[in-house]
UniProtKB/Swiss-Prot annotation:
D-glyceraldehyde 3-phosphate binds at R166. PANTHER family: PYRIDOXAL 5'-PHOSPHATE SYNTHASE SUBUNIT SNZ1-RELATED. It catalyses: aldehydo-D-ribose 5-phosphate + D-glyceraldehyde 3-phosphate + L-glutamine = pyridoxal 5'-phosphate + L-glutamate + phosphate + 3 H2O + H(+). D-ribose 5-phosphate binds at D25, G154, G215, G236, S237. It is an enzyme of class 4 (lyase). Catalyzes the formation of pyridoxal 5'-phosphate from ribose 5-phosphate (RBP), glyceraldehyde 3-phosphate (G3P) and ammonia. The ammonia is provided by the PdxT subunit. Can also use ribulose 5-phosphate and dihydroxyacetone phosphate as substrates, resulting from enzyme-catalyzed isomerization of RBP and G3P, respectively. GO terms for molecular function: pyridoxal 5'-phosphate synthase (glutamine hydrolysing) activity. Belongs to the PdxS/SNZ family. This is Pyridoxal 5'-phosphate synthase subunit PdxS. It holds the Pfam family SOR_SNZ. The lineage of its organism: Bacteria, Pseudomonadati, Pseudomonadota, Gammaproteobacteria, Pasteurellales.
Amino acid sequence: MSVILGSDLVKRGMAQMQKGGVIMDVVNAEQARIAEAAGAVAVMALERVPSDIRAAGGVARMANPRIVKEVMEAVSIPVMAKARIGHITEARVLEAMGVDYIDESEVLTPADEEFHLLKSEYTVPFVCGCRDLGEALRRIGEGASMLRTKGEPGTGNIVEAVRHMRKVNSQVRKVVNMSTDELMTEAKILGAPFELLLQIKQLGKLPVVNFAAGGVATPADAALMMELGADGVFVGSGIFKAENPEKFARAIVQATTHYQDYDLIARLSEELGEPMRGLEISKLSVQDRMQERGW
């Protein structure tokens, strides 16, 4: 069988290679090297971590290409970068730069409130956020090769990531237990392609990996998300907004790998210093909830 560059098989295979690992947000080469040394399987290059984007307000855009290049030159692990929802040119620029993945991200200010990118038209694989199975399958239908929970980025509060992971997994179980003749109606309810629901029923799971993201701030948070069925973990502000980023990075990687070794997680957590300061989700207005962006 010939393998075509940019095909779903290749792009999904690249995402599978990150399974079980931690992907860390970084804003410069020094942070990227810390992440790689700690055992991160990939880094996300951006100008500001989500907590700083939230604090600054205004319009958040794709990172300056200089920052992305600096990170790409600093590490040997895959480098991801974020593009705004629906921003074709930002995505094409990142693809031309040679990033390993593009995150069509609700952390940035959406460029298009009606249309997401048609990710199947790109050679580079995409990761997208989701809150439920309908969102997940719409993004896969557009060509996403990897999913992540939206959570609530930049808050250090894991509750929304937990909600989204549990929601997706419970809906997957429901589909798996349906008879085939019920799937078309479920596709209508979810607003998702019938063919993807059929794949889920046949596979017994999503056809792509689904990582946890949005609110991971401690080793225990990372382990919890793995316990709930995540294929891996994204950590945004939780590393470099912590008191000791190097220790936090190493501890979160180990906790993700050994997520059911509770004695180890306790030891890892003993002398880390203070984690990032957290935000209570209920105090955020609807317009300040990044998870509401996209559909």
